[in-house]
């Protein structure tokens, strides 16, 4: 049995059995997923069992064979098919398909062969069409012509008759080609018609160019069918083109292989062999799918988060209105991979992956660029034939499936690791290649990739696809077996864009598969002792000869480093022996030295002197003293040791301290070190005759710089003496200092110094000015990981300090978060690239993968780049400005925060001397010193200087901060401090006031009371401005005192708010009970007075209404509905109001009779809703009821949306049998009319609106119209996720979008936009009938140049701050206008002419009576120059109505504004960089605009509860 398996594996891999290396894995020998599937099927036929998963994983062949077991026939065993030909088609992914989420219909019981073969019975058992076939058919029905394959190949004219006959025999033998796909209401079914519609057309063309044109013509059908065409060229009697147009539901790439092979066999004279019945295979496959459904659902559930978060939208400009080409087929771009197939196969074998995984990994890399995301979604074409169904690998028919796969592109991951991960994903995905979308996924990807292997009989040219097909997927990629890539693209993409995609793809694939002259000169000097270059050479030869007997090339050798001659000899001896030098400071703690030695992987420890061997690490295998080795050399008279190091080999290993205290060993190469020191200035001006001081720590790479600069270029290295480590500075030309050391030294003490290099720390201006006046002063920047240094700058006194420009052999990039080059002046992370970049960290591959990766900017050099973690930018002179580390820059709940900057700002607060801030999940933890600091006071001070999202949730005064073993702040321990301090804090530790406030918060925010702590923030917990108003009312009622809205906005936490309430109660600002003031019933409110002014002299006042309309069905009792309305209108005196002129003012007059509802036969809503009101003579409420419609229209002078909802709620109660609420508070007794603006609030508005812009357009009347659109669904879904995770309100988001839409071409934003202010200040006000709503101006200001790395969220944050400031200082509208000295000139609105409103799902009008369906309506006219009204429907859709004055805006202008708003919403939610945001808004202006009518649109009277 095992011999049989071995033979089959060898045959499948095309390897002689005797040469099969069974110690390797299947993939290492060249196997892939399809060959594994084929091998499993072949073994089944001969009674052997293998698993595809075993074959694809990195398991030796011998282990697979030893674990295999035979399969023995029983009564229920699988039949052994007669066809045992092992040569199955080598394809599973060949044709690009058009997926659809439509699920397949239900199937019935198992059919018998008789019923399957029945052709004259219409009652045969129904076999469900496989889901993918059904989706292809449905897609074609929706878009005729889609999913029709055009397959062509060239055939000899002499063979044409036999070929035609062979095609006919093969198609007639296969059941799929006589199958009808019957679509019924309950699903789709396979029906055997008993007839094969075999059609051929013959066409002759004059030349080959015409042949190509004929071949590319549209098929003669556009539905589910197939036909053949033979195209010949006149005068050419050699070949013909056979063209087969066939719908994808009949055949997939796998089946095409089978069909072509069968046709070839019949042409060769073999009898035709019918394959298994497709209906039978489909039915049995469907049964197994049902059995495994739970497994599939679990798998897709595990993938849900990744798939939902992955990006698939290609961020390239598209023409959404691109005209359809006169050509039927989508265009195809062709590319050739410049890597040999054998090289790819070898690569895949070495790393135990498959070649397709390389292609999928490469395309994922491309998507990460063109989708601007590190998590991308792509479509994977699978055979759908992995299930154990008899005949599934032999059946003709379409079983192909296209599945989504999310790939995370981690910038720090090495190439091999990335491809291996993609390979594992593909293997796992292939286990579910049969799973339909109903199991828990959606086919919503913008690109799909398929592999296509050799097709028997195909002799087409290599630069054309053998098949093509139009689909709804924008980008379809096919990789042919000859390494030609065909990229088929939708019309909305430009060819230049597709060329870029293809070029990136092919490049991504390619990137985955480049002292003797002065022997007596002094090399080194230590006090009176010296060593010549000849001595250094001879002595190091001795060490090298000895080491070479014990180490291999590239082995690390550690040295007990201390400044002496034998130390230098040890270094060069190691390098000559081909080893890697690793210095371990003689002053190291023994335990740390031992740990470093173990990390290095060394076995040998060299010491300069014999007395130092006692310091050998415990882990060392050998220890030798250089002085002993030199004595042996003298005794034995060794010959010269000849060694030429490899340029790419490692030269030295230098340990740097890690952030966790664990040292990192950095491996640097000979090539990098030599390149670094080629420049004279960089190498410390080292040359013969120059003296270079050795001052840097012997274990620091600064000493490497000193040693090799001096000794590689003939200079003398001057070592420090132990007694006076700085005395040698009096006698040298050049040296390296840290700025800290330079600060302690006086330049005048060292007159011989010519060149001083500062490294390791930032240089202060003071140090620069002192030293640059005396010596040539250089500032060098560069971490160990880039071989000593990356940039250099010659500093001058009084000039700004920078780190200069790159060394000649280093490239420096400033990259943004997406790895793109940042413009000059814009901050980003500093990346170092080029030959100097080291080989990473020894023994820490994960850390290496996080920081080192191929150079993505200069891709053609095959070099790497290193992410330094430092932030910097290029200044105006082209110099690099380094600002420090970026490890502490985080994104918290959508906001960027620099924790280091936050620490500095908190440290400057009163009573705080030092602060340390760490992240704990979605919260911040701040430790402050001294321990006596008051956390509550800290929080108050923070609220004054920090945005809400930057205020730590936990503020803990401590005596000392947690530290790591190497003396750094331990931020992990800091975060855990919050767990220790707060884990045992029960809710009953809250004060009584805090507990009551927390209960009210929980109710208003609809959240669990246990989630609210004393440090909770209302906005962070999901609150917004309207909920703050509701909270104010609840608190007023609960505590019987007036809690100003300003207190709610300013309170950072629940504790702060509770303390403020306690103070208000102590002050007894309000009595527990107070009587409404006495007043004249005829008086009118401030807002009523303003509306009267608007009515005066304006005939176009149809927009001055609030309306509600709904559709009624037969379940509604019309008489009871009328009675309910009459009762409610009778109960509220304010609804009888009329307004009459009396002398020089207006007074309220109450009608003797309340308004009553009118029953009419037909309600003409459009006409009725636009009928104006006469304030003096008309009832200002109209309720009209027809058999199918209810329309309520109320003048705005007595009604706002809150009042309308109160009335609807009253009607609902009365309709259900309750009494009307006649005890609602009196309108003129409302708290709102008793308010007087505070001086501080008026002062705020003076400053807030100072020098604000004003609308220049002048209105003639309130005439206008509306345009209504629907926000794209994908934007709505993204908006919902955004609102759940951010602290912005819907209205703030809308304000930001509209501000951008109105000012898209400005460098900075400064505009005043209005918003609605509820103006109801108490619970009583919230239940009062009448007009309260007032306008409130919001000033939107944003200067992107003043914000580092400005992006959409930075702009949103400025909008939020402005919005909160305006609301917290809200004053009566008329007082504000008067205070600012503005005289209203209606119809021009004071202060602003644009209004923005946002009605959320819970804030819309509702009448909960069975049989009523609310309708969307609006009236003609325009209350403002432009009003942008967002309304969320019950199904989640968002409507945007733009009400505008046609005298100011043309329909095209409004259409452009609408497009801008939609675009701005999408970009704000995605938080794109500011320049990208503005750039895409500019593109909107250039797009084709479709202008549609306003109120005549289909949304007028559309249901608000749309499905």
UniProtKB/Swiss-Prot annotation:
Q: Please list the residue ranges that the record marks as compositionally biased, kind Low complexity.
A: 105-115
Where in this protein does the record put region Condensation 1? Answer: 163-429
User: Which biological processes are named by the entry's GO terms?
Assistant: amino acid activation for nonribosomal peptide biosynthetic process; secondary metabolite biosynthetic process
> Please, which domain of life does this record's source organism belong to?
Eukaryota
Domain named Carrier is located at 1-72, 988-1065
> Which pathway does the database say it acts in?
Mycotoxin biosynthesis
Q: Where is this region: Condensation 2?
A: 1099-1471
One of the record's GO molecular function terms: phosphopantetheine binding
Keyword Phosphoprotein among UniProt keywords = yes
The EC code for this enzyme is 6.3.2.-
Q: What results from gene inactivation?
A: Impairs the production of acetylaranotin and of the cyclo-L-Phe-L-Phe intermediate.
Region spans: Disordered: 98-119
SMART domains annotated for this entry? PKS_PP (SM00823)
Query: What's one Pfam family here?
Result: PP-binding
A cellular component term from Gene Ontology for this protein is: cytoplasm
Name positions with the PTM O-(pantetheine 4'-phosphoryl)serine.
33, 1025
Q: Which UniProt keywords apply?
A: Ligase, Phosphopantetheine, Phosphoprotein, Repeat
Q: Where is this region: Adenylation?
A: 514-893
What biological function has been recorded for the protein in this entry?
Answer: Nonribosomal peptide synthetase; part of the gene cluster that mediates the biosynthesis of acetylaranotin, a member of the epipolythiodioxopiperazine (ETP) class of toxins characterized by a disulfide-bridged cyclic dipeptide. The first step of acetylaranotin biosynthesis is performed by the NRPS ataP which produces diketopiperazine cyclo-L-Phe-L-Phe via the condensation of 2 phenylalanines (L-Phe). The ataC domain of ataTC then catalyzes the formation of bishydroxylation of cyclo-L-Phe-L-Phe.
Family assignment from sequence similarity: Belongs to the NRP synthetase family.
Task: State the domain notes.
Answer: AtaP has the domain architecture (T1-C1-A1-T2-C2). The single adenylation (A) domain in ataP suggests that one specific substrate, L-Phe, is loaded onto the T (carrier) domains of ataP.
Which protein, by its recorded name, is this? Nonribosomal peptide synthetase ataP
Q: Which organism is it from?
A: Aspergillus terreus (strain NIH 2624 / FGSC A1156)
Q: What is the lineage of its organism?
A: Eukaryota, Fungi, Dikarya, Ascomycota, Pezizomycotina
């Amino acid at each position: 049995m095992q011999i049989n398996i071995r033979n089959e594996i060898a045959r499948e891999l095309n390897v002689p059995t005797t040469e099969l290396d069974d110690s390797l894995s299947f993939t290492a020998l060249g196997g892939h997923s399809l060959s594994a599937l084929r091998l499993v099927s072949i073994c089944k036929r001969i009674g052997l069992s293998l698993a595809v998963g075993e074959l694809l994983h990195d398991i030796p062949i011998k282990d697979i064979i030893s674990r295999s077991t035979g399969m023995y026939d029983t009564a229920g065993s699988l039949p052994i098919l007669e066809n045992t030909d092992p040569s199955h088609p080598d394809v599973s992914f060949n044709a690009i398909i058009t997926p659809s989420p439509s699920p397949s219909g239900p199937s019935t019981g198992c059919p018998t062969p008789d019923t399957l073969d029945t052709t004259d019975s219409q009652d045969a058992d129904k076999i469900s069409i496989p889901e993918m076939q059904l989706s292809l058919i449905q897609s074609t029905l929706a878009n005729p012509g889609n999913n029709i394959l055009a397959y062509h190949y060239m055939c000899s004219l002499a063979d044409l008759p036999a070929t035609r006959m062979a095609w006919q025999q093969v198609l007639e033998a296969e059941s799929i080609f006589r199958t009808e796909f019957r679509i019924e209401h309950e699903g789709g079914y396979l029906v055997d018609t008993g007839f094969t519609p075999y059609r051929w057309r013959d066409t002759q063309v004059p030349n080959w160019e015409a042949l190509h044109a004929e071949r590319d013509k549209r098929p003669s059908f556009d539905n589910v069918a197939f036909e053949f065409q033979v195209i010949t060229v006149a005068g050419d009697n050699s070949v013909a083109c056979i063209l087969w147009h066939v719908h994808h539901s009949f055949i997939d790439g796998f089946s095409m292989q089978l069909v072509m092979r069968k046709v070839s066999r019949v042409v060769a004279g073999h009898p035709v062999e019918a394959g298994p019945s497709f209906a039978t295979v489909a039915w049995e496959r469907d049964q197994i799918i049902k059995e495994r459904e739970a497994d599939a659902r679990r798998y897709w559930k595990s993938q849900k988060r990744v798939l939902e978060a992955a990006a698939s939208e290609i961020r390239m400009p598209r023409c959404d209105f691109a005209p359809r080409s006169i050509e039927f087929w989508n265009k195809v771009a062709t590319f050739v991979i410049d890597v040999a197939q054998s090289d790819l196969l070898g690569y895949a074998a070495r790393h135990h992956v498959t070649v397709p995984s390389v292609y999928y990994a490469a395309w994922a890399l491309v998507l990460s660029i063109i989708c601007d995301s590190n998590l991308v979604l792509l479509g994977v074409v699978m055979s759908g034939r992995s299930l154990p169904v008899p005949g599934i690998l032999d059946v003709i028919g379409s079983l192909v499936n296209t599945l989504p796969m999310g790939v995370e592109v981690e910038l720090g991951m090495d190439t091999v690791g990335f491809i291996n991960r993609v390979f594992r994903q593909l293997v796992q995905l292939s286990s579910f290649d049969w799973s339909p979308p109903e199991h828990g996924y959606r086919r919503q990807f913008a690109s799909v990739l398929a592999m296509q292997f050799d097709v028997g009989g195909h002799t087409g040219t290599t630069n054309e696809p053998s098949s093509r097909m139009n689909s709804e997927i924008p980008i379809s990629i096919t990789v042919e077996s000859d390494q030609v890539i065909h990229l088929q693209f939708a019309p909305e993409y430009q060819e230049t864009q597709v060329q870029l995609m293809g070029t990136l793809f092919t490049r991504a694939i390619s990137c985955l598969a480049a002292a003797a002259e002065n022997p007596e000169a002094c090399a080194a000097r230590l006090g009176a002792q010296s060593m010549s270059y000849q001595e250094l050479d001879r002595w190091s030869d001795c060490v090298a000869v000895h080491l070479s007997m014990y180490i291999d090339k590239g082995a690390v050798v550690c040295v007990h480093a201390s400044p002496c001659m034998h130390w230098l000899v040890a270094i060069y001896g190691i390098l000559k022996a081909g080893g890697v030098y690793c210095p371990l400071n003689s002053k190291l703690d023994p335990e740390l030295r031992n740990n470093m030695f173990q990390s290095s992987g060394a076995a040998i420890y060299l010491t300069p002197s014999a007395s130092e061997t006692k310091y050998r690490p415990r882990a060392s295998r050998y220890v030798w003293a250089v002085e002993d080795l030199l004595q042996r050399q003298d005794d034995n008279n060794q010959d010269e040791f000849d060694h030429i190091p490899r340029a790419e080999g490692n030269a030295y290993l230098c340990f740097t301290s890690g952030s966790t205290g664990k040292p990192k060993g950095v491996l640097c190469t000979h090539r990098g070190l030599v390149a670094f020191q080629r420049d004279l200035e960089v190498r410390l001006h080292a040359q013969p005759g120059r003296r270079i001081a050795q001052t840097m720590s012997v274990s620091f790479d600064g000493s490497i710089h000193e040693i090799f600069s001096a000794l590689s270029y003939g200079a003398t290295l001057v070592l420090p003496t132990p007694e006076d480590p700085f005395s040698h500075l009096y006698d040298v030309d050049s040296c390296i200092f840290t700025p800290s050391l330079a600060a302690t030294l006086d330049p005048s003490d060292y007159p011989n110094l010519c060149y001083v290099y500062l490294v390791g720390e930032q240089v202060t201006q003071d140090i620069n000015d002192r030293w640059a006046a005396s010596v040539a002063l250089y500032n060098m920047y560069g971490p160990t990981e880039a071989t000593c240094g990356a940039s250099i700058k010659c500093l001058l006194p009084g000039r700004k300090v920078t780190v200069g420009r790159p060394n000649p052999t280093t490239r420096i990039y400033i990259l943004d978060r997406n790895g793109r080059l940042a413009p000059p002046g814009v901050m980003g992370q500093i990346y170092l690239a080029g030959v100097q970049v080291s080989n990473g960290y020894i023994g820490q591959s994960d850390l290496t993968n996080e920081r080192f990766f191929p150079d993505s900017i200069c891709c053609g050099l095959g070099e790497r780049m290193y992410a330094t973690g430092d932030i910097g930018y290029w200044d105006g002179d082209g110099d690099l400005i380094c600002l420090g580390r970026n490890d502490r820059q985080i994104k918290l709940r959508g906001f960027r925060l620099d924790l280091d900057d936050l620490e500095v700002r908190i440290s400057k607060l009163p009573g705080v001397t030092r602060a340390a801030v760490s992240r704990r999940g979605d919260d911040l933890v701040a430790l402050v010193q001294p321990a006596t600091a008051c956390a509550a006071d800290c929080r108050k001070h923070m609220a004054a200087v920090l945005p809400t999202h930057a205020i730590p949730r936990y503020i803990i005064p401590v005596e000392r901060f947690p530290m790591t073993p190497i003396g750094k702040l331990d931020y992990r321990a800091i975060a855990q401090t919050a767990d220790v301090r707060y884990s045992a804090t029960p809710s009953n530790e809250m004060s009584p006031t805090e507990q009551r406030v927390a209960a009210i918060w929980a109710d208003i925010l609809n959240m669990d009371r246990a989630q609210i702590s004393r440090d909770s923030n209302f906005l962070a917990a999901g609150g917004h401005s309207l909920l703050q108003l509701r909270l104010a009312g609840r608190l007023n009622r609960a505590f019987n005192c007036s809690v100003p809205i300003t207190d709610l906005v300013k309170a950072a936490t629940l504790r702060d708010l509770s303390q403020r309430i306690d103070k208000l109660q102590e002050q007894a600002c309000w009595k527990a009970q107070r009587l409404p003031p006495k007043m004249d019933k005829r008086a009118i409110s401030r807002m009523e007075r303003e509306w009267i002014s608007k009515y005066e002299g304006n005939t176009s006042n149809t927009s001055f209404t609030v309306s509600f309309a709904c559709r009624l069905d037969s379940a509604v009792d019309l008489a009871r509905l009328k009675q309910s309305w009459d009762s409610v209108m009778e109960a509220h005196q304010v609804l009888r109001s009329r307004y009459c002129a009396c002398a020089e003012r207006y007074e309220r007059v109450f009608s003797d009779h309340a308004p009553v509802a009118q029953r009419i036969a037909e309600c003409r809503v459009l006409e009725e809703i636009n009928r104006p009101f006469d304030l003096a003579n008309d009832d200002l409420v109209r309720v009209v009821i027809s058999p199918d419609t209810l329309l309520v229209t109320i003048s705005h002078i007595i009604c706002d949306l809150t009042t309308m909802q109160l009335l609807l709620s009253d009607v609902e109660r009365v309709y259900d049998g309750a009494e009307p609420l006649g005890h609602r508070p009196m309108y003129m007794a409302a708290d709102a009319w008793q308010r007087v603006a505070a001086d501080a609030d008026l002062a705020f508005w003076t400053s807030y609106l100072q020098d604000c812009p004003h609308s220049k357009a002048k209105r003639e009347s309130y005439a206008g119209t509306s345009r209504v659109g629907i926000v794209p669904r994908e934007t709505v879904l993204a908006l919902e996720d955004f609102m759940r995770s951010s602290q912005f309100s819907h209205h703030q988001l809308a304000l930001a979008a509209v501000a951008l839409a109105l000012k898209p071409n400005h460098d900075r934003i400064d505009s005043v936009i209005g918003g609605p202010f509820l103006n109801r200040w108490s619970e009583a006000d919230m239940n009062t009938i009448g007009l309260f709503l007032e306008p409130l101006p919001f000033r939107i200001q944003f200067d992107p140049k003043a914000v580092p790395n400005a992006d959409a969220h930075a702009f949103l944050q400025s909008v939020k701050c402005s919005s909160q400031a305006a609301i917290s200082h809200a004053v009566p509208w008329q007082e504000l206008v008067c205070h600012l000295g503005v005289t209203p000139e209606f119809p021009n609105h004071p202060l602003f002419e644009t209004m923005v409103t946002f009605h959320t799902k819970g804030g819309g009008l509702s009448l909960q009576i069975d049989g009523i369906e609310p309708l969307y309506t609006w009236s003609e006219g325009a209350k403002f120059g432009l009003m942008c009204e967002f309304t969320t429907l019950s199904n989640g859709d968002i409507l945007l109505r733009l009400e505008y004055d046609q005298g100011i805006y043309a329909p095209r202008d409004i259409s452009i504004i609408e497009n801008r708003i939609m675009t701005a919403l999408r970009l704000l939610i995605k938080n794109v960089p500011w320049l990208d945001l503005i750039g895409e808004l500019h593109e909107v202006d250039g797009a084709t605009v479709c202008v549609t009518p306003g109120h005549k649109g289909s949304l007028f009277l559309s249901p608000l509860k749309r499905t």
